[in-house]
C-alpha cells in the first residue's frame, strides 16, 4: 500500500512514511493510492470479532510494510486504557442507536484514534532512533486526547495550540493540568481556525519542518482517519447481527475528519452496508452549505456555540473529499485550495448532485441542541453532550 498527496506533488510513500509525514510536502493531505475492498464473505468471517481483532484486520490492509505482530501489539496497547471492553459500544436509545465514543482516557471520541497514533509514533521513532516535535491545534477535544496519547513517551514533545477561553472548562483543565515534561500548552488569542492556520504555516515551511522534525497529530494525519474507519465497520457488523443490512450514520461534524472516515468505510464495504451519511453541523455551517448549495465559503467569524469542538469554518479534511470529487486529479485540487486560501471561497456548485449522493446535511441551532438534550434526558434518562445532540437532531429532521 502506497500513499500519495491530494495535490499530486510527491512520489508515492509507505505507510510508515505517511504516519511520520502528516501533511504532505506539497501542502496536500495523504491518501492511499488505491482503496481495498471488503467482501461480504470477509464480513461473515469478521462478524463476531472483538474490536481489537477487527482493528488489526482493517489496519493491516493499509499498513503492509509493518509486521502484523507489531501492529497487533500497538493496537492492544492503544486500547488497554479504555473503560469498556467493546471500546465503542452501541446503545439503543429510543428509535436510534448511539455509538458511544467516550470510553477512552479523556472521554473524547478522538481517544480512539490518538491512543493508537501515539503508540505508532513511539514505535516508528524507536526504529529510527529519531525524535519528533508534534505541533497541533485544537478546538477542544483533540488537544487533551493528543496529550494523553503521547504524554511521557520517549523521543516526543507535543505543543498544542488552543483558542483562549473558547474550549470548555473541563477540556482546558485536561490540557493545562498535565505536568509531563514533554507536554506544552499554548493559548492563542483567536479562534481554532487561527490556531490551525499557524500549524499549517509551520508545516508548509519545509526547512523548519525538517530542522525541528515536526509531526502532525491533527486529523490531517491519515492514521487518525484510518483508526476511525474501524468503528464504522464495527458498528455495521454489530447491527448486522441484529438483522440490519443497511445503516445510516449521523455524524456531528466540524473538521470533516470523522465523517470522512465514514465515507472511506462506505467505499471499503459491500455496496449498501452504509446507506446515508448525515453531516450534522452547528451554526458554523460551511459544510452544510456545501452539501445543500454547493457553497464552500467562509461566512463571517466563527460563532461560539455549546458544541465548541465543531466551531470551525475551515474543515481541514475537506480537501481529501475534494480529491475524489475531482476524479483524483491533484492539479485541480491544488488550484481550488489555492483559490480558497486567497479568497476564502470555492464555487463547488458543479458538484451538488454528487455531494447529495454522498451526504445529507443539516445545521442545528443552539435552541434545537438544548431541546434535544432535554428530550433525551426526560424520555430516555440518557444525558447527551451537545455534539451528540447535534447529530441526533439532524438524524431526526432528515429521517426518511
How would you label these PLM feature ranges?
Residues 1-400:
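PLP-dependent amino-acid enzyme catalytic core
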